[in-house]
């Protein structure tokens, strides 16, 4: 629904509109779990939401794809979506990594606790490498891609994050749970979207929004990680104590 409104607002051309709808239909994936962990959210809730949404998308993605192609490209022919291909993509990029993590946590809990800090540091470094790598790989296309769909992709990310957090808080959930729901709502699996666009629908234009989104998503993720961790850092505590009379406390 958010993607549909943004497509109308920014007047996105048909091929990119279909790509945005594909992206919006995808679940969060391991990336959303990683970002939730780095943002000190409820990681267990994030993993559960990803697992459930990944299963649900087996049914919702084909429906959204068929509707999007018919609506935005004004075609009368109904495209056939191979659910088995979607299931294979989901297994590779979402369900298998989640299952491995849950098995390690269950059978090797001491090892999982011991590795928590090193994994957190490594995860942040991997995230940085991914951003740099994507930027270098797509350096020739960054400006054209962003000029076409940059604002709509960034808006999808930010609006979904804000709606997820606000809705969770209004429902009475705590801050950790709200962070998890926010990230799960606002961080889509760009890899899966690209796989569907190119591997199943065989249209590279459909993959452009996901490619742009992958860059903007990682940038907003780093901002979120910085904000959630800055509050607990020694520097932030010193600043807070120094300027406490002028500090506006965020009670959300």
Predicted regions and their residues:
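Alpha-helical transmembrane segments of multi-pass small-molecule/ion transporters
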Residues: 1-252
């Amino acid at each position: 629904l958010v993607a549909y409104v943004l497509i109308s607002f920014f007047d996105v051309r048909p091929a990119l509109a279909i790509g945005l709808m594909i992206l919006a239909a995808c679940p969060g994936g391991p990336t959303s779990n990683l970002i939730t962990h780095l943002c000190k959210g409820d990681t267990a809730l994030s993993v559960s939401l990803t697992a459930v949404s990944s299963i649900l998308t087996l049914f919702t993605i084909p429906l959204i794809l068929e509707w999007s192609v018919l609506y935005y490209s004004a075609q009368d022919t109904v495209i056939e979506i191979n659910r088995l291909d979607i299931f294979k993509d989901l297994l590779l990029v979402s369900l298998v990594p989640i299952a491995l993590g849950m098995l390690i946590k269950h059978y090797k809990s001491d090892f999982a606790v011991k590795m928590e800090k090193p994994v957190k540091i490594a995860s942040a470094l991997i995230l940085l490498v991914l951003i740099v790598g994507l930027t270098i790989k797509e350096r020739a296309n960054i400006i054209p891609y962003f000029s076409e769909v940059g604002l709509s992709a960034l808006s999808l990310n930010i609006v979904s994050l804000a709606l997820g957090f606000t809705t969770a808080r209004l429902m009475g959930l705590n801050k950790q749970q709200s962070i998890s729901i926010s990230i799960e709502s606002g961080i889509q699996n760009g890899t899966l979207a690209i796989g569907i666009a190119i591997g199943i629908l065989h249209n590279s234009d459909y993959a452009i929004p996901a490619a742009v989104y992958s860059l903007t998503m990682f940038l907003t993720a780093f901002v979120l990680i910085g904000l959630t961790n800055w509050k607990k850092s020694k520097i932030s505590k010193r600043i807070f104590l120094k300027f406490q009379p002028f500090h506006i406390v965020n009670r959300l």
